Curated annotation (Swiss-Prot):
Belongs to the RuvA family. Homotetramer. Forms an RuvA(8)-RuvB(12)-Holliday junction (HJ) complex. HJ DNA is sandwiched between 2 RuvA tetramers; dsDNA enters through RuvA and exits via RuvB. An RuvB hexamer assembles on each DNA strand where it exits the tetramer. Each RuvB hexamer is contacted by two RuvA subunits (via domain III) on 2 adjacent RuvB subunits; this complex drives branch migration. In the full resolvosome a probable DNA-RuvA(4)-RuvB(12)-RuvC(2) complex forms which resolves the HJ. One of its GO terms (molecular function) is four-way junction DNA binding. The RuvA-RuvB-RuvC complex processes Holliday junction (HJ) DNA during genetic recombination and DNA repair, while the RuvA-RuvB complex plays an important role in the rescue of blocked DNA replication forks via replication fork reversal (RFR). RuvA specifically binds to HJ cruciform DNA, conferring on it an open structure. The RuvB hexamer acts as an ATP-dependent pump, pulling dsDNA into and through the RuvAB complex. HJ branch migration allows RuvC to scan DNA until it finds its consensus sequence, where it cleaves and resolves the cruciform DNA. This is Holliday junction branch migration complex subunit RuvA. GO terms for cellular component: cytoplasm; Holliday junction helicase complex; Holliday junction resolvase complex. Keywords: Cytoplasm, DNA damage, DNA recombination, DNA repair, DNA-binding. GO terms for biological process: DNA recombination; DNA repair. It comes from the Bacteria. Residues 144-152 are annotated as: Flexible linker. It is found in: Cytoplasm. InterPro entries: DNA_helicase_Holl-junc_RuvA_I, Hlx-hairpin-Hlx_DNA-bd_motif, NA-bd_OB-fold, RuvA, RuvA_2-like, RuvA_C, RuvA_C_sf. Residues 65-143 are annotated as: Domain II.
Length: 201
């Protein structure tokens, strides 16, 4: 079992990041939230890990915060929710907003995640609502409750930008290389523009 990894950030793909440690590159699957918090290539980063072992697959899943890792584990505890679906849920909004959606029974917010239908959303709400206690939320988090859907798209930015660049004819490798040099806090439109400037040099 692994607790965390600390190493150099070396790249990003649609659903994973590459972290180099002792000259070994680790492919670590992660959410849009964690991707949006990645530093510049070559900078050090720490990810909290969960290893998933199946008969035909062994994978590492990592997150920049323990809170997101714990939410990932909670989602995996639900029947019918696998790692891919859990990452999808953690990519539609912040962990806090996802908590709010579950506690408030907001099926609409939860079904925004690709691959999550109404029945799965209902199961998530039913099984996790009581596990997410109000005392886990800070006063600052409570102030955000009215805007649960307002800013939940930002974690899609990286994946959407990569997809857009590839749709324009660039390879995944070319798109990734350009995106690594772009400010990830920008909007999708501006990330695409900045990436294109780099690609057209």
């Amino acid at each position: 079992m692994y607790e965390y990894i600390r190493g150099q950030f070396q790249g990003i793909s649609k659903d994973y990041v590459v972290i180099e440690l002792n000259n070994i590159g680790y492919r670590i699957f992660t959410s849009g939230n964690t991707m949006s918090n990645m530093p510049k290539v070559g900078d050090e980063v720490l990810l909290y890990l969960e290893q998933i072992v199946r008969e035909d697959f062994i994978g590492l899943y990592g997150f920049t915060t323990k809170e997101e890792l714990e939410m990932f584990k909670l989602l995996l505890s639900i029947n019918g929710v696998g790692a891919k679906a859990a990452l999808s849920l953690l990519s539609i909004s912040t962990v806090n907003n996802l908590k709010y959606a579950i506690m408030m029974g907001d099926e609409k917010h939860i079904t925004r995640a690709p691959g999550i239908g109404k029945k799965t959303a209902q199961r998530i709400i039913l099984e996790l609502k009581d596990k997410l206690k109000p005392d886990e939320l800070t006063s600052e988090e409570e102030q955000l409750i009215e805007g649960i859907n307002d800013n939940s798209d930002y974690s899609f930015n990286i994946n959407e930008t990569l997809s857009a660049l590839m749709a324009l004819g660039y390879t995944e490798k070319e798109a990734q290389k350009a995106l690594e040099k772009v400010d990830k806090t920008l909007s999708i439109e501006n990330m695409i523009k900045e990436s294109l400037k780099l690609l057209m040099r």
